[in-house]
Amino acid sequence: MEEKDSCYHVPVMLRESLEGLDIRPDGIYVDVTFGGGGHSREILKRLGSEGELYGFDQDADAEHNVPADPRFTFVRSNFRYLYNFMRYYGESGEVDGLLADLGVSSHHFDDKDRGFSFRFDGTLDMRMNTRAGQTAADIVNNYTAEALADVFYLYGELKVSRKLASVLVKARETKKIETIGDFLEVIKPFTGKDKEKKFLAQVFQALRIEVNDEMRALKEMLRSTLRVLRPGGRLVVITYHSLEDRLVKNFLKTGNFEGKCEQDFFGNVRSPFRLVNNKVIVPTDEEVERNPRSRSAKLRIAEKV
């Protein structure tokens, strides 16, 4: 099981995450990004017989990694429904700590049939939940030029978003874009030799975020933590790109996504959280060397007041 999980996804900043949760043996914890179960298994090692852990994941593949442990409950769902499920289990307002590792797992990147990586040819899919929702191919073939440009600009931060969208719309008039190979062939003129990987990463990130409605889902999950965590409960979040990190940073600091500071009568900043680490935590050089995919990770820890 351990070997299989290490292939599925290597837990990023594992030690720092566990320290951030400040685990109590009899506590109630939630891993909203279960994936390969690496973080969850380490949390279980630190829980006593009365402790409880809930793991969320919308991907059916993650169920193969569920530990046979009576203290663990697997929730096959998008983490945007965190509050609904924790209320169902009678744990709303009782949770001692919540972990969210927002990165795409190695399992997804390395499975050519899932369509997350430009390294392989395969179906242009990118759905985390393969049973529902539109695929990346659906978006590329059906969105208007304006809608496509918005996706590439807002989620990929691409300056050539309008030109890129226009080329895609024109290309699909001749032939439907169904595979990663089809897609790469169309956008080839935009990929400069020096920054090809960076450009493609931005394009694929934009499509993935749109396919899975990631930014809205993240906002809903973060709002839910206000009702799920008990006072003193810890929120530990690992981000991988500037869009999600900005949301998390603002939310933990101010309680909203715009970063607007609200003050009380005495001029003190009002926030539902107290920052545990004022400075963002990043992987050590040793971890990055061991796991290059951790390079862009940022860890933030806060405590509900």
UniProtKB/Swiss-Prot annotation:
Family listed: Belongs to the methyltransferase superfamily. RsmH family.
Enzyme Commission identifier(s): 2.1.1.199
Presence of the UniProt keyword DNA damage in the record: no
Subcellular location per the Swiss-Prot or TrEMBL entry: Cytoplasm
Top-level taxonomy: Bacteria, Pseudomonadati, Bacteroidota, Bacteroidia, Bacteroidales
Main subcellular location: cytoplasm
Catalyzed reactions: cytidine(1402) in 16S rRNA + S-adenosyl-L-methionine = N(4)-methylcytidine(1402) in 16S rRNA + S-adenosyl-L-homocysteine + H(+)
UniProt entry keywords in alphabetical sequence: Cytoplasm, Methyltransferase, rRNA processing, S-adenosyl-L-methionine, Transferase
Gene Ontology BP terms: rRNA base methylation
Xref: Pfam families: Methyltransf_5
Gene Ontology molecular function: rRNA (cytosine-N4-)-methyltransferase activity
Source organism, top-level taxon: Bacteria
Binding positions (S-adenosyl-L-methionine): 37-39, 57, 85, 101, 108
Function field: Specifically methylates the N4 position of cytidine in position 1402 (C1402) of 16S rRNA.
Protein name stated in the entry: Ribosomal RNA small subunit methyltransferase H
InterPro entries in alphabetical order: RsmH, SAM-dep_MeTrfase_MraW_recog, SAM-dependent_MTases_sf
Gene Ontology, cellular component aspect: cytoplasm
